[in-house]
Regions:
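A short, well-structured alpha-helix characteristic of acyl/acetyltransferase catalytic modules
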Residues: 1-19, 140-147
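Acetyl-CoA-dependent GNAT
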Residues: 8-67, 73
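Extended, folded domain segments that form the structural surfaces/walls around functional sites
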Residues: 67-68, 96
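Conserved acetyl-CoA-binding loop-helix of GNAT-fold acetyltransferases
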Residues: 70, 75-89, 103, 107, ...
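Conserved GNAT acetyl-CoA-binding A-motif
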Residues: 89-101
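Conserved active-site alpha-helix within GNAT-family acetyltransferase domains
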Residues: 100-126
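C-terminal "cap" of GNAT-fold acetyltransferases
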Residues: 122-147
Length: 147
């Protein structure tokens, strides 16, 4: 099913990701193999009136990637919260990396009771927070933090 919609999902993310989604994250989704389940990996979409209004994609609970985008006309209506909630409920936990100047995403994460547990310099050179939701464990990403 992913192959049928992959190009549309990527186009949506490029268009509505407000230029905050990394090329690495988009390549991850583009290259995500089909045919078998990947532990901690899920994609969910939000649809309103038969129109795609939001996407979330998480790889390895967010340790590999966690990307979300919502169409501007659907923002501040709970779409992003529903998508994050779906992923946390389905996977049991979720991690995200958010640059400290991305106030919209930080507001979303903190409104979902995500916990900031580490800060590092992200790929854009900006201070970036690691956040966890649900049954998150710092040890799960310890090797990444200490690199």
């Amino acid at each position: 099913m992913l192959d049928k919609y992959r190009s549309r999902l990527l186009l949506f993310l490029r268009k509505y990701g407000d230029q905050r989604l990394t090329h690495k994250a988009l390549r991850w989704l583009r290259d995500l193999p089909l045919g078998r389940e990947h532990l901690g990996t899920a994609i969910a979409v939000a649809v309103h009136n038969k129109q795609l209004v939001g996407i979330i994609a998480v790889g390895k609970y967010g340790v590999d990637e966690a990307i979300i985008a919502v169409k501007p006309t659907a923002r501040n209506k709970g779409v992003a919260k529903q998508l994050v909630s779906f992923i946390v409920n389905r996977l049991g936990r979720m991690y995200a990396r958010v640059a400290v100047d991305n106030t919209a995403s930080l507001n979303l994460c903190f409104s979902m009771n995500m916990v900031a547990f580490d800060m590092f310099t992200g790929v854009t050179g900006k201070p970036t927070l690691w956040l966890g939701a649900g049954d998150w464990r710092r040890e799960e990403i310890e090797g990444i933090i200490n690199k």
